[in-house]
Amino acid sequence: MQEPANGSRYILSEVEVMGKGGLVAQPVAPPPASKGKIILSGGNWELQRASEVTASGEEISTPGYKPENWIVATVPGTVLSSYKNIGAIADPNYADNQLQVSESFFWSNFWYRDEFEVPEGFKQDRLFLNFDGINWKANVFLNGKKLGRIEGAFMRGKFDVTDLVVPGKNVVAVEIIRNNHIGAIKEKNKQSTDFNGGILGADNPTFHATIGWDWIPTVRGRNIGIWNDVFLTSTGKVTVADPLVTSVLPLPDTTSATLTAEVIVKNHDANTVNGTLEGKVGDITFQQLVSLAAGEEKTVVFDVKDFPQLKMENPHLWWPKGYGAPNLYDANFTFKVDDKVSDAKDFKVGIRQMTFNEDNHILSLFINGRRFIGRGGNWGFGESNLNYRGREYDIAVAYHADMNFTMMRNWVGMIGDEELYEACDRHGIMIWQDFWLANPADGPDPYYPEMFIANAEDYVKRIRSHASIGLYCGRNEGFPPEQIDKALRRIIKEDHLDIHYISSSADDVVSGHGPYRMLPAKEYFTLKTGNDKFHSERGMPNVMTYESMLRTFSPEGIWPQDNEWGMHDYTREGAQGCTSFNEIIAKGYGEPQSAKEFAELAQWVNYDGHRSLFESRSQNRKGLLMWMSHSCWPSMVWQTYDYYFEPTAAYFAIKKASEPLHIQWNPATDEVEVVNYSAGTHKGLTAKVQVLNMDASVAWEKEATVDSNEDTTDKCIKLEFPENLSKVHFIKMTLTEDGKVVSDNFYHRSLEENNYQDLCQLAKVALQSATTVDKNADGTWSAVSVIENKTSTPALMIRLNVVGGKDDQQILPVFYSDNYFSLLPGEKKEVRMSWRDEDTRGNEGKVLITGYNVE
């Protein structure tokens, strides 16, 4: 081929691959039947593009049909994931591999097929085939019969297959219907991310962001497929579903709680069924007789008027992170007919009362009588190709709790995995739950409002049992169409009455609209937008570590900043405006000459910027959700840890800034502030601040006594900067209670604002350290490092990094008690770390210690 004269890339229109091939994909064995349930994930699922199939669904779903040239399918998973998992396409997350994935091939209907057997004795009165999520629509067939259709990415499918399942081999076939309005690929480059969203919004509920946004590339196929669980359930004549337990406390007293429990029951028989519905929350039990006409479905409610035992004494309340423990009770509903279990549902209950007001046109949230301050971030997806499972959600949400976050936002509602809600319940992270409407500028109103409303009704019932649900929101940065808005208000009122609904994420009683680019740290304290309201989106680029850059970029694309960087969201223009990030690094620390130097200097900016992002909200403490706290693919912007679960410096800055009781410097006023978000009352605290020259000599210091009440900010010391300070100097502050440090902070400041290049004059420091590594009884690993600076020079941006003792490769994820910290001469610090054995690759971990001026 001849290189194009204009220097552009080649366009490959056709390729033929010959040879014996390499690895052959093998299906994963499905788990055995358990408690009336057979999981059909894994197993014998196969997949084929619909254009390659001439048979009907009735034919495909028979044992005699012989699939030819079908591939092994990943279920649950998207169509694209199946092709990636068999090696048919390159990993679209790496470098610019996304350009090698065909848009036209994956814009198609696809067929899934699975053969399974039902164990003898499994079948009771009724047998159901269940789908927890497909995209976009699906026709479902079993043993030669069409069962029905599922429409919308968040609608469950449940089909009565009692009379269709046979002994021996059974076959299910699913025709996945592609989106009607796929839109165009976003062309990201070093300058621009292209425009956000597009016509795919017409098909909502779907995975709208897969059309491409400034934080995610265009996903080929738009995540069509069987993306959530498929399973068989066997029950008696009556089923139970979608439980809800609400709590009312005699506030401000929290020593008792009045519970109301409800569940939906349905009779699948052709005759009236009489039975007993039994319920249990913790040690409290209750029951009532229920009569259901043929085919009848209804909600059965238990309240304290008829069941006085539902007044719980001394409940262990569910609290968000920083307010208390997220206590959960085991709960159950069981329907019995003639003392035989027809169906049962186990779930978890958090005893908590959410209340809300919109006084003065400002939304305020309260939990168990205390004002709730939402601090956290927006999530777009768990993973861009929907590859997260329970393990990944648990890690990510645990990271959020470790950062002292209290809330996450399910932006535009595109995460539908039960495992997210379960993890938030366990870790005490409240959820701001959006519905599937992006900014009106980023896509049209849904063309199929009835489908949208049906999905919304089903989805609210599905998630309503979770204590972590804190708020529902109709639309991102806009208002839903009137038909949908009215329907959403009705649905919440009928099905989840104790949770508040707002129409818009960024207007009316809340605030939003950024900014999204990097600003000098001080400027966040002077932003007026949304200062008096809960602000739903504000962020800045957050550059990954050099180790993760090596995992993300090709050797030729890692430096200088070019189109591969743009493909991974680091663009000069657009909302992230990474030009300002580059300028702040260059002015503050000098122009980086390599990707490694850039990544290391970027951690300074990551830390200072994100600390200011949250510390600047101290005036009114109305809450902030950063844009974004979680990245769903290898991105160079808007995250706290990266796609590989590597925390950046921003993670630890946020962890500090979001402490329930916190001491901080307000650079706009030079006040030292003690901020109490959720720590209760603390009397007689001692605040101490020192201004130090670059050689660590004390230029000025002062102490003050502070009484701090919850939900307050107290100014306690006015900083002074004496003459003859070194050009770059430090501010160190501590907050102590009974001699114990409860919060500390360390800043660097310059007489020439934002220019810290004199730091490069600091001598290299040899730190003293001692580390112990232990394997715990539960199979996890723990390490403790004690680091001491015995020199006369400050040691800055000290980073601990756990790697394998044999292969020297990072172990991820790892929880660090602190990182990217500084030690003055004579200071010593203990850092605790933990990780899972399954992530070690057979290595015992060791801890590497580096830093800005550390040898």
What is the role of each PLM region?
Residues 398-401, 425, 617-618:
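Non-catalytic positions within long, well-ordered alpha-helices that form the structural scaffold/packing
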Residues 37-40, 46-55, 74-78, 211, ...:
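Substrate-binding clefts and catalytic carboxylate motifs of secreted carbohydrate-active enzymes
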Residues 4-6, 52, 135-136, 179, ...:
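Short, solvent-exposed loop/turn segments at secondary-structure junctions
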Residues 19-23, 49, 120, 176-180, ...:
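A generic secondary-structure signal for well-formed alpha-helical elements
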Residues 407-573, 602-605, 609-613, 623, ...:
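Substrate-binding/catalytic cleft of secreted carbohydrate-active enzymes
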Residues 1-27:
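Aromatic, loop-rich ligand-recognition surfaces of beta-strand-rich domains
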Residues 26-407, 411, 646, 652-855:
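Secreted/periplasmic carbohydrate-active enzymes, especially glycoside hydrolases
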Residues 4, 15, 20, 50, ...:
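Flexible loop residues that form catalytic
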